[in-house]
Amino acid sequence: MNYIRITRENIDREHICCAMSGKQSLAKKEWLKQLFDEGLVFYRSEERGKCFIEYIPAENAWVPIEADGYLYINCLWVSGSMKGHGYSTDLLDACVKDAEASGKKGICILCAEGRKREFLADPKFLAYKGFKVTDVSDCGINLCVLTLTENEELPRFKACAKHPQVSEKGFVLYYTDQCPFTCYWVPRVKEVAEEYNIPLKVIHINDRESAQNVPAPVTTYALFRDGRFLTQSIQSDKKFLALAGIRD
């Protein structure tokens, strides 16, 4: 398999795997353009399909972690017909090579406790590749690290991510444009919340400083109810109604 690096120069003519076209693709591409100057790297397969990796120096990552000197993987996604061919290893190897070449201490990424969860890395794959859990949030989301040097300080969650909570009653949703699916589903969830008079506060994160202080380990999509973290899984309008106890 051959891979393409998406850059500011070619992004307008290349697809980005998780969103092939339309408004979702445009929102994601604008978000990527914003971060290219901060060291974001995006590799994808030459073939059409979901096979890509996206990473950035951890100091510039839109997550509340303390990981100076590391790379942070926003997303490593290989699915459908692309699975089972070693492409995840190829993409991860490219990240490791970049980390070594730039003198990074290691690589970090989020995964779930014990099993694969939607929009998080597979913990079994990470363990197989040598990643270790270095911190755990109260909601069962782990910070995993592959170290490339010895005796270095390991990445940790900030307190706001380690103990996720909000003060508001009802539903509270934090999200960024890092995942194009939020562009499609968040407006639909807002519509049904208004239609059924469901208390919902939506916070669109537009800058790094805000993202690094979100009260959750995940910023792409973090849904709370009555102060408690519910899920990082992007909800459709029907799934959201089900969470609210409404069967449409």
Place the predicted regions along the sequence by residue.
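Short amphipathic alpha-helix that is part of the acyltransferase structural core
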Residues: 1-48, 160, 181, 188-192
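Conserved beta-strand in the GNAT
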Residues: 44, 48-59, 72, 77
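Conserved acetyl-CoA-binding loop-helix of GNAT-fold acetyltransferases
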Residues: 78, 84-100
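Conserved GNAT acetyl-CoA-binding A-motif
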Residues: 97-118
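Conserved active-site alpha-helix within GNAT-family acetyltransferase domains
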Residues: 113-138
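C-terminal "cap" of GNAT-fold acetyltransferases
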Residues: 138-163
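Local sequence-structure signature of Cys/Sec-based thiol-disulfide redox active-site neighborhoods
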Residues: 160-195
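Non-catalytic, surface beta->alpha helical segment in thiol-disulfide oxidoreductase systems
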Residues: 226-248
